[in-house]
A protein has these predicted regions:
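N-terminal small-domain helix-loop-helix segment of the aminotransferase-like
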Residues: 2-95, 102, 283, 391-392
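Conserved core segment of the aminotransferase class I/II
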Residues: 222-299, 303, 307, 389-390
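Conserved glycine-rich beta-strand-loop-beta hairpin in the small C-terminal domain of fold type I
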Residues: 281, 297-306, 318-331, 363
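Hydrophobic residues in well-ordered beta-strands that form the structural core
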Residues: 116, 137, 199-200, 353-355
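PLP-dependent enzyme catalytic core of the Aspartate aminotransferase-like
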Residues: 344-353, 359-392
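Helix C-cap/helix->beta junction micro-motif
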Residues: 131, 193-194, 224, 349
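Conserved core of the PLP fold type I
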Residues: 59-189, 206-207, 211-222, 229
Length: 392
């Protein structure tokens, strides 16, 4: 089936955070390219599966054949990444952020430090803080124009006895790096040296550019598996964030028991949402054709955006993202004041973006743009930014 990613779909009135949770003072007619979900209609097999479930008309307590659900998840891992995962090591959560919060509670105590790599997805720092832990920053650095891990600083952070572990973003949001096997192995060796854990948020794992390979962290360190947790979900991949289902891969039997004690017994989240399971099963068994077309479309959007920026915003700096559908645009040469830049984007350009400073001070002067939308909307957004910064 051929899917039409150029179709513009009105999402008003659908409880869409992207279109209804807008900043105060958002002008009429502003374009919304901030929240990381897609403006593409879901794969037809997913829609049909949900229709069939809804048509039944009864939505009582659900009991799943967990082996069937988990088999579908690990089958996807094997097919897309040649990653062998045992079903017994897969656990469910309404989302990766709730899972990270639970894991922080299980693996650390109040006052412990947890390493992150800014500029990075801001809920990492938020969940560390709300759980009364301490953020230990090891910022990414630029080498020959590319973002890379600062292994010297990472070693210092891991060596510090106050720091007990790390949250990794892989692929990295917002900078778009897809870490190579060598980069990941080097990171694991440092963690292993100091016997520290790593929580790897891999929610964007399916969304990489053509020719780029994502490596699940657990795949390359079986000997250290008890100290690594990998978090995945169908939500970014298949535009299912509202379905609230994520898959958490935990190897350590002791941590598995603690997880069940907290998430199942204490919080009562024993089973995933009925619609979430229905959507995920359809996605992982029948959604690949849709996904391949969407990835190809996003790749072309990225190319079009890069070409436009190079020609029309010569003082901007932008790396071609290896993964995600997020563009990390450095506009600091046009406006060095991050709050003023944010105001220009909202009030003058009339585009709602994720302002770089929310990802940490390393993001000052940047804007994060979601390109998972019809190309006409993306190009309109870039044209508005250009007009606001350099004139028509």
């Amino acid at each position: 089936m051929k899917y039409n990613c150029d179709e513009s779909i009105d999402r008003q009135g659908t409880q869409s955070a992207k279109y209804q949770m807008l900043p105060d003072g958002t002008p009429e007619g502003a374009l919304s390219l901030w929240v990381a979900d897609m403006d593409f209609r879901c794969a037809e097999p997913i829609i049909k599966a949900l229709h069939d479930r809804v048509e039944h008309g009864i939505f009582g307590y659900s009991l799943y054949k967990l082996s069937e659900v988990k088999s579908t998840v690990v089958g996807w891992y094997k097919k897309r990444f040649d990653w062998d995962v045992e079903e017994k090591n897969v656990f469910f959560s309404p989302g990766i952020i709730p899972a990270l919060s639970a894991l922080i509670q299980l693996l650390s105590k109040e006052g412990d430090g947890i390493i992150i790599q800014p500029p990075v997805y801001f809920p990492f720092a938020g969940k560390i803080g709300v759980n009364r832990r301490v953020v230990a920053n090891s910022p990414l650095i630029r080498v020959d124009g590319d973002y890379v891990m600062d292994y010297e600083t990472l070693e210092e952070k891991f060596a510090d006895p106050k720091n007990v572990g790390m949250i990794l973003c892989s692929p990295h949001n917002p900078v778009g790096r897809v870490w190579s096997e060598d980069e990941l192995r080097r990171l694991v060796e440092i963690a292993k040296k100091y016997d520290k854990w790593i929580l790897s948020d891999e929610i964007h794992f399916d969304l990489v550019r053509k020719g780029v390979k994502h490596t699940p962290l657990l795949k390359i360190c079986p000997e250290y598996a008890d100290k690594v947790v990998v978090c995945t979900a169908p939500s970014k991949t298949f535009n299912l964030a509202g379905m609230q289902i994520s898959n958490i891969v935990i190897h350590d039997p002791e941590l598995q028991e603690k997880w069940l004690g907290l998430v199942d017994d204490c919080w009562g989240m024993m089973m995933p949402n009925a619609m979430g399971v229905t959507a995920m099963m359809a996605a992982y068994t029948q959604g690949e054709e849709w996904l391949d077309q969407v990835i190809a479309y996003i790749d072309e959007n990225m190319k079009a955006a890069c070409a436009y920026v190079k020609e029309n915003l010569p003082k901007a700096r932008m790396d071609y993202p290896e993964g995600t559908y997020l563009l990390w645009l450095d506009l600091s040469e046009y406006c060095g004041d991050p709050e003023k830049l944010a105001e220009i984007m909202l009030k003058k350009a009339k585009v709602v973006l994720d302002d770089g400073y929310i990802f940490g001070p390393e993001g000052n002067g940047f804007e994060r743009i979601n390109v998972a939308c019809p190309r006409s909307i993306l190009m309109d957004c870039l044209e508005r930014i250009k007009t606001a910064l350099v004139g028509a």
